[in-house]
C-alpha cells in the first residue's frame, strides 16, 4: 500500500500525540488538506487523533468529510475510516 503525501495512516505502534504532531507538521509545511486513515482497531485511535487536534487547534482545523467502508486484505474484510481535515486560516 502506497501512502500519499497528505495521508497519515494511524498505526498501533505510534501513540495519539505522535500522530497529532505529524498532522501539525504537514499543516506547517503548507499542505492544506490531510487525510487520516484508521483501519480495524485503529479506527477509534484515528477519531482520538482528530479530537486531540480539535482541542489543540480549535477553529484552525475543520472536518471536511468522513468516509467509512471496508477493504479486502488477505481474504479478510477490514473496516476503515477516512477523516479529511482542512486547515482553516
From Swiss-Prot:
Q: Which organism is it from?
A: Saccharolobus solfataricus (strain ATCC 35092 / DSM 1617 / JCM 11322 / P2) (Sulfolobus solfataricus)
Q: What does this protein do?
A: Binds single-stranded DNA, RNA and double-stranded DNA. Involved in DNA compaction.
Keyword Phosphoprotein attributed = no
Taxonomy, top ranks, is: Archaea, Thermoproteota, Thermoprotei, Sulfolobales, Sulfolobaceae
Subunit structure, interactors included: Forms homodimers and homotetramers. Homodimer at pH below 6.0. Forms homotetramers and higher order homooligomers at near the growth temperature of 80 degrees Celsius and pH 7.0. Interacts with Alba 1; heterodimers lack cooperative DNA-binding behavior and result in more compact chromatin structures compared to Alba 1 homodimers.
User: Can you say where in the cell this protein is located?
Assistant: Cytoplasm; Chromosome
Where does this protein hold Zn(2+)?
14, 18, 22
GO molecular function annotation: double-stranded DNA binding; RNA binding
Taxonomically, which superkingdom? Archaea
InterPro entries, per the entry: Alba-like_dom_sf, DNA/RNA-bd_Alba, DNA/RNA-bd_Alba-like
Post-translational modification comment from the UniProt entry? Acetylated. Acetylation at Lys-12 decreases DNA-binding affinity.
Keywords recorded for this protein, A-Z: Acetylation, Chromosome, Cytoplasm, DNA condensation, DNA-binding, RNA-binding, Zinc
Q: Which residues carry this modification: N6-acetyllysine?
A: 12
Family to which this protein belongs? Belongs to the histone-like Alba family.
Spell out the protein name for this chain.
DNA/RNA-binding protein Alba 2
Q: Does the record carry Methyltransferase as a key word?
A: no
Can you quote a single GO CC term?
chromosome
Q: Name one GO biological process term.
A: chromosome condensation
Please report a single Pfam family linked to this protein. Alba
Amino acid at each position: 500500500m502506497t501512502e500519499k503525501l497528505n495521508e497519515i495512516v494511524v498505526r498501533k505502534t505510534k501513540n495519539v500525540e505522535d500522530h497529532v504532531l505529524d498532522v501539525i507538521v504537514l499543516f506547517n509545511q503548507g499542505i492544506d488538506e490531510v487525510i487520516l486513515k484508521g483501519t480495524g482497531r485503529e479506527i477509534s485511535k484515528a477519531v482520538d487523533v482528530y479530537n486531540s487536534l480539535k482541542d489543540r487547534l480549535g477553529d484552525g482545523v475543520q472536518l471536511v468529510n468522513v468516509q467509512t467502508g471496508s477493504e479486502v486484505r488477505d481474504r479478510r474484510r477490514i473496516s476503515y475510516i477516512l477523516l479529511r481535515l482542512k486547515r482553516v486560516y
